[in-house]
Amino acid sequence: MTDAQTPSEDLPQLQVNMQYIKDLSFEIPGAPHSFIEMQGKNPEIPIHVDVNVGNVGANAYEVVLHLKIEALLDGKALFILELAYAGVFTLNLPEEQIHPVLLIECPRLLFPFARNIVADMTRDGGLPPLLLQPLDFVELYRARAAEMNAQQGQA
């Protein structure tokens, strides 16, 4: 009897190969006047989140976390920040687990780094650092799946 594992069992199930800023844009359209307008006010700050996945090789995937943040005061943009933060992941998982891991676990691993970039960019732009609250990628995954099912139902 042997307890030897096959080589595929020895591999990590999820490996982070690299992380990087794929695209970053930050603007304060009304500067310097917008700094004065903002004082003592709380702008509305909607955050749009999306996750895209692409295959880059054998069991290797690029996961891109997209954040679009726009601070609005009386309908006017105070600042606009767009970030595409990406990572390349190698997965050694059963086929049925790959999609949820790519859209839930991988963005969850990328988020703290993207959150830090957002805080640094807003601070370096002369604003108070914007500290994003944790995101529920499971809920985002479910909402996306429901949306896709609804679209397929209409087709």
UniProtKB/Swiss-Prot annotation:
GO terms for molecular function: unfolded protein binding. InterPro entries: SecB, SecB-like_sf. Belongs to the SecB family. One of its GO terms (cellular component) is cytoplasm. The gene is secB. This is Protein-export protein SecB. Homotetramer, a dimer of dimers. One homotetramer interacts with 1 SecA dimer. The lineage of its organism: Bacteria, Pseudomonadati, Pseudomonadota, Alphaproteobacteria, Rhodospirillales. It comes from Paramagnetospirillum magneticum (strain ATCC 700264 / AMB-1) (Magnetospirillum magneticum). One of its GO terms (biological process) is protein folding.
